[in-house]
Structure formats: C-alpha cells, structure tokens
C-alpha cells in the first residue's frame, strides 16, 4: 500500500491514493478517489441520517446500504461509521485493488463486521440480492463515471418499498445542452445550454428515472437535489405502487425559452409556439420533471437536528447549512431561474443586488426566492418582461 496515504474525512479514516491528493484530475489508477467530492459525501451523510430517522420500517427489516460504484469505499465506509441506523453496508467495485483498499480502511475503523465487499459489474452486484421485496436494500447509491442511465433499472429493482436511491451524473456536457441527441437517448428529454441548464439537467435525471420506475410499478419522490460544476445529484424516495406510478405524468412537462428576449415558461404539453413578447422561436427542453424537488419538512428537521447554531462553526458545515436553508425557501415548483447578470444585461445597466431584486418582485405581488442552483440566481412566477418592468419602475 505504498501508493496510499491515510486521511480522515468526517469521522472516518480512509486509505486513499497519494496521486489523488496531488494531481488536479484524480487518476483512475491504482484506484479512484476524488477529494473535491467531499461536499457531495458530506451532504449524503446528512440526508441518509435524517431519512432513516423518519424511515417507517414496519416490516422490521435489517437496514442496509448498497454502494454500487464503491471505489475505495469513501462513501460506503462513511455510512458505516457515521450513519448508525444502518446495520450492513455492501460495497462493490470492479477494481479489485479498490476493494482491497476499502477492506483495509474498514479495518482501520473497526467496522469489518458491518461491511460486505464484492468485486462485480454493477447490475450483477445489485441483482445478487434475493428478489423478494423484504430482502432488497434500504438505500442504494449510484455514482458512476459518466451517465447513470445504463444502471437505473438495476437500481430500482434492488431497492425496497419506502427506500431511498441517490444518483450522481457526471456527463455534464450531455445534460447541459452540448449533445442534445445523446441526452434525448439517455434521459428521454432535450437539454439546453443556457443560464439555468444545471437545473434542467437535474430535472432530466429525475424525470428519466421516474419514467423507468413507472414502468416497474414504482413511484419516485425527490427529497433533495443539488449540482456542482462537475456533477448533478438527486435523492429519490421509492414507493412500490402501480396507482402512484400512474401519476408520473402529472409532474412532467416542457420548458420554453426565448434566447432573444429571455422570456421563459413551462407547460405540460409540447408545443412549438412563438414567444409572446418578441415573436421569436422558442427553444424547448424536456420532457422533464416540473414537480417539486425538496422534502422541506424533512430538510427542516435535518437542520434542527444536525445543523444547529452550535454545530455550524466549521466552514464546511456552514456551506452545507446554507444550501439546506436556501432549499427550504426555494420555489421548487418553478423549473427554471433567472440570474442577476442576465437581468442586468437586459436592462443594460449594472445589476442590483440579488436580495433587492427579490424584495422588489415580492413587493409587486409575485413570488420570489433564491435558488440552490446558483448563488446569483432567483426563482419567481414573474416573467422576464414583468421583472424588467418592475425594476425599471423602481429605479
């Protein structure tokens, strides 16, 4: 293990490749570890803990966690140490050296008995569990290199009723409108390259997963999502119910965006109409999830239990709490946002502060909020033309 070094992340000791801490792009050899994804893992630990606090284990099943692309175990081992309600953690990877390293890290943390390791292709690993519903995993995490789309059905078939799936996508160019045909093939919808493409991307992941789930008689409900320059991540609660699965289309629709005047709106129906403001052709993204993205009651409970004022002195915890705080107030029933810069550009003037713009929109009778997707973004049910009129009047 000369090429590895011991670090501590959260409360967990990890053996990680030295090169992954020294190089700008973490190498895949001898095993992959991304130190920049710590925020991703920290957020996950909070979500898993609060989910299991509210988890209704009526069948008294053993609570299990599956890390399908486990790598060196950075997520799965942290769950074993930092999520006490989980009884068994299954860590899988195709890289034998990564699993050997994960086993060594498990020994360092004295959690050998809680961890089961396997070296297998992802779908073979997931379906290796008995198919009876009471033998499925409570939580399944899918964090592949690139698109999660080839593995979604395997994940859905391996998770129990009322369980949780967490999914990461790193094919950012596809989901951000650069390769639209690829996006349509993988995510059943068109992406778009504009200021709010990261929210469109996140909603495409939710919608494509929900459509596959519906075919299996499974309904999904987002409890939290977030994005980073390098990835998009969603947490979805699972309900095995044909009647609920039939309702999936109630939460699907299309976003129409005018690149000329900045107008945007959304509809449940696909239509190639023209912009009502400037008569230009709309660019359409979707079919995508237009429903809500956050379980705000759960997030409020999370903040109260784990991120009280006394626990937020740490800079990382402050950043995480800020994300959760914003999500609680976010207008997540609106599937896009505006940015301060684009509003300033349309007005041909220096933009006002975000808080001031939100205040003026609300004072004019509209709803408005910040968004988790961009520090300079705002959500509102006002149109771009409404926003510009409001800000011009109040200058």
Language-model features and meaning:
Residues 1-395:
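SAM-dependent transferase fold signal centered on methyltransferase-like domains
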